[in-house]
């Protein structure tokens, strides 16, 4: 009995961290990204950032320090990517209980990553 209980607890602890992560959503059109986003950009430090994405995938982002970048989201072989005035890389969109999260990861690790939540 103790063995079964220990096994059950081990399985629950192993699976429970996965429940907190939302699965990536397959983006079929960059129009799905249109709107205002707020989050964090990380290069050497982490700072607040805002981004506005147009229906054609073009975007403008700025940080609280005043750094700005413009870019374009696009689909390549069914995968969401971006190219900006600073870097290029992959992007992913997830939806967890109605909260849309957009993650951007530069191909070159020197340029860091960003994570935004849709605000409108």
Task: Tell what function each PLM region has.
Residues 1-32, 36, 40-42, 119-120:
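Amphipathic/hydrophobic helical signal segments and adjacent flexible N-terminal regions
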Residues 1-2, 67, 101, 116:
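Intrinsically disordered, low-complexity sequence elements enriched in Ser/Thr/Gly/Pro
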Residues 13, 72-73, 99-102:
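Generic low-polarity alpha-helical segments
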Residues 22-26, 41-50, 79-120:
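Beta-sheet ligand-binding and adhesion/scaffold domains
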Residues 35, 61, 100-104:
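Conserved glycine-centered beta-strand/turn positions repeated across beta-sheet architectures
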Residues 43-81:
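N-terminal glycine/threonine-rich, aromatic-flanked beta-hairpin/loop signature
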């Amino acid at each position: 009995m103790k063995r079964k209980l220990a096994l059950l607890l081990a399985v629950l602890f192993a699976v429970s961290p996965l429940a907190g992560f939302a699965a990536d959503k397959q983006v079929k059109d960059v129009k799905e990204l249109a709107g205002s986003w707020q989050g964090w950009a990380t290069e050497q430090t982490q700072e607040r950032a805002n981004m506005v994405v147009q229906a054609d995938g073009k975007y403008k982002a700025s940080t609280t320090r005043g750094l700005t970048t413009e870019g374009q989201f696009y689909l390549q072989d069914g995968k969401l990517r971006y190219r900006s005035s600073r870097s290029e890389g992959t992007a992913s969109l997830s939806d967890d209980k109605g909260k849309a999260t957009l993650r951007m990861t530069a191909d070159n690790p020197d340029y860091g990553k960003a994570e935004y939540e849709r605000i409108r």
